[in-house]
Amino acid sequence: MTGRAFLTGATGFVGSHVARALCNAGWRVKALVRRSGNPRQLGIGDLPVEIVPGDLSAHTDLADAVSGSDAIVHVAGLVRARTLDDYREGNVLATVRLLRAAHQRAPDALVVLVSSQAAAGPARDGRQVCEGDVARPVSGYGLSKREGEEAVEREWKGP
């Protein structure tokens, strides 16, 4: 499958690698980049990526940006914050805004959320954590990432 992919977090470590992989696979990539970001300095300057200035706090930015996307890959996330509410703003509410914009402008898109091991919490009794295990995050970051996963499960009614 190839087509038009909308990517958040493209200037971060994981996101820049996702951008490169999408481009190498033949996707046309549109990346949401904070107005303060410089893609040339952030790992994607050499890629044929369409840069869309904006952020996840503005629904209008998102609705226009996701329009016509075949896939939405949400890598962006808040890793450091002072309070749980700040984490929730960056990792839950931003995700919900993105999903609602997608419902309006790209309802048939494939949605991929990149989360974190922190959402599951640490392994217990020396065994691997599996998808079906009960999540037991131990930090505000992990809790907010788990809540972001739950938001996708609850909010996304795509194809």
Q: Which residues does each predicted region cover?
A:
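N-terminal Rossmann-fold cofactor-binding loop
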Residues: 32-37, 55-56
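Conserved Rossmann-fold NAD(P)-dependent oxidoreductase catalytic core, especially the SDR/UDP-sugar
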Residues: 79, 96-140
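SDR active-site strand-loop-helix element
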Residues: 8, 32, 72-76, 111-117
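Active-site Tyr-X1-5-Lys
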Residues: 138-159
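N-terminal Rossmann NAD(P)H-binding glycine-rich loop of SDR-like oxidoreductase domains
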Residues: 3-27
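NAD(P)H-binding glycine-rich loop region in Rossmannoid oxidoreductase-like domains
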Residues: 53-93, 101, 119-120
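Short, conserved SAM-binding/catalytic segment
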Residues: 38-49
